[in-house]
Each structure stands twice: as structure tokens, then as C-alpha cells.
């Protein structure tokens, strides 16, 4: 997890640009990031979603703002969603997003979430019930295949 990243391999140039862009969130954790995340694919919470959308499997490159997905934050992604509801009404649809103010994750079914949790934790699996999520949403810019999760 590195604030402001979206699935690209974190090299020195990208890290330096993120330190300049986010001096507190990235610069304040520079040593940890260099020791743990340098030369690995990194993403923040919404970057995990954007990175998959922007990834071009043919070229194996991340193309910013491609496939109709703009460069927006977690709260704007929630605001832009046309299909959403309170977390207690979440349908069992794989790939829905779960949201709380300032943070977003991906529902993978059966009460489980994948989320980019924080710089020192990274990307984790978590329990839907334990995350403090307030709402679910269909991620704008993604077409869903309505298939229910299986055990």
C-alpha cells in the first residue's frame, strides 16, 4: 500500500513523485515504504480498483485513465455510483465495492472483502462485518456479470 498509487511497480521515480505529491502520507513513511514496497506493485484503496481497470493485459502496462475509469478518489467513486445502498442491503454480487467515508474495498462474496488497508498492512482479506463499511455500490465504469457467489 502506497498512497496515490494504482498497481504499478513502485520504482524510485514513482516513489519520489508520491513523496512530493503526498509529503505526509508517503514522505512520513518513506523508510518503511522503501524497505517493504519498493519494486513491488502498490496501490491505495481506490488505486486497487483503478489499477485493475487501467491495466492492459496485452501490453502488461497500466494506462492511466483508460477503459472509461477516471482518476477519482474513493468518496467520488461512491458519489458517482448510480446503484448503491446501505451495507445491510448488500446483494451477494461478486466485485461490488464497499465504502465508508474515505475508504473503499472490493466485496468478493460470502462476507469477505479485499482492501488496500494501509501502508504498514498492505492489501488484505477482511470480514465484511468487521470493516465498519456503511454502504455498497456497483463501481461506475465497470459492467457486472450478475453471478452469485458460491461456497
Where are these regions (language model features)?
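N-terminal capping segments
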Residues: 1-61, 101-103, 114-116
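Aromatic- and glycine-rich peptidoglycan recognition patches
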Residues: 40, 58-91, 101-151
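Loop/turn positions that initiate beta-strands
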Residues: 93-96
Amino acid at each position: 500500500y502506497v498512497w496515490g498509487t494504482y498497481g504499478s511497480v513502485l520504482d524510485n521515480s514513482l516513489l519520489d513523485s508520491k513523496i512530493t505529491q503526498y509529503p505526509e502520507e508517503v514522505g512520513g513513511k518513506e523508510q518503511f515504504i522503501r524497505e517493504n514496497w519498493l519494486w513491488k506493485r502498490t496501490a491505495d484503496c481506490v488505486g486497487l480498483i483503478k489499477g485493475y481497470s487501467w491495466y492492459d493485459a496485452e501490453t502488461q502496462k497500466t494506462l492511466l485513465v483508460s477503459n472509461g475509469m477516471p482518476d477519482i478518489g474513493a468518496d467520488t467513486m461512491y458519489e458517482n455510483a448510480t446503484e448503491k445502498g446501505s451495507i445491510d442491503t448488500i446483494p451477494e454480487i461478486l466485485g461490488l465495492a464497499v465504502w465508508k467515508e474515505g475508504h473503499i474495498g472490493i466485496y468478493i462474496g460470502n462476507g469477505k472483502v479485499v482492501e488496500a488497508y494501509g501502508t504498514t498492512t498492505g492489501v488484505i482479506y477482511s470480514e465484511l462485518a468487521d470493516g465498519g463499511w456503511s454502504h455498497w455500490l456497483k463501481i461506475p465504469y465497470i459492467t457486472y456479470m450478475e453471478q452469485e457467489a458460491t461456497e
